[in-house]
Amino acid sequence: VLSTFAKVSLNEDAKIFRDTYNWIVRYVHGMKGNTLLDIAQQLIDNKEKKDYFISAMRKADFNISNISIDNEARMHSGKDVFFTHHTIDGSDFTLSSIDQSLGTLRYFQLQECIFNMLREDHIYSFDEIESNLHYDLLLHFLTTFMMNTANSQILFTTQDQQLLDEEFIRRDMVWFTEKSKEDASTELYCASEFGLHKNLSLYKAYKTGKLGAKPELGSIF
């Protein structure tokens, strides 16, 4: 219904649909998000946002002191966004986005979510949120979200089993998917449905196969 609404012009009787559609467009965000160049341009235009990003990247031990765009370099070499790194001895060096690690770029882009959720209630979704991130950085991102936002939500898939062992991960937050052998359909179920004792490790229960959602691997020989 909402996808159709975006393509047609309706009268004032459809105000409830218009309001719902506008809310989703503004506050619900898919997995791709803005490009690196889009974010960098926003930082140049918004000092508050730029200061937040630089502070967040420093807290994450990236030592980034500035972000800039070189339009001339972009035209000639494809290098557009540049990161200035500050070293202990006081010297600085600059790397283009092409030369940055995927982990640095991934964490940089994730900061847009936190910045927005600190100011308004948003919903973000990610597929394999841990992609290219050191586990400690993933935890830093998730705990920053948990401790500093009010009514925002993050929906994400992950292959990282270690998260099941974290104290801030409640059982009603965790959902598993298991593929049927018969028809290849996928069943979705919540960890809280198992009624496990509160002292039983969710991580260990999953590792030992009590919760399903594990591939049945054949012999390596």
Predicted segments — roles?
Residues 54, 101, 111-114, 130, ...:
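Generic hydrophobic alpha-helical scaffold/packing signal
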Residues 72-115, 120-123, 129-133:
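Conserved ABC ATPase signature
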Residues 1-19, 111-116, 202-221:
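Short, surface-exposed secondary-structure junctions/capping segments
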Residues 57, 100, 127, 157, ...:
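Conserved RecA-like P-loop NTPase ATPase core
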Residues 1-72:
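Electropositive, glycine-dotted interaction segments
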Residues 134-139:
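Short alpha-helix of the ABC ATPase nucleotide-binding domain corresponding to the H-loop/switch region
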Residues 56-67, 87, 207-210, 216-221:
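N-terminal accessory segments
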Residues 73, 140-221:
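C-terminal lobe/lid and adjacent interdomain/linker elements of RecA-like ASCE P-loop ATPase modules
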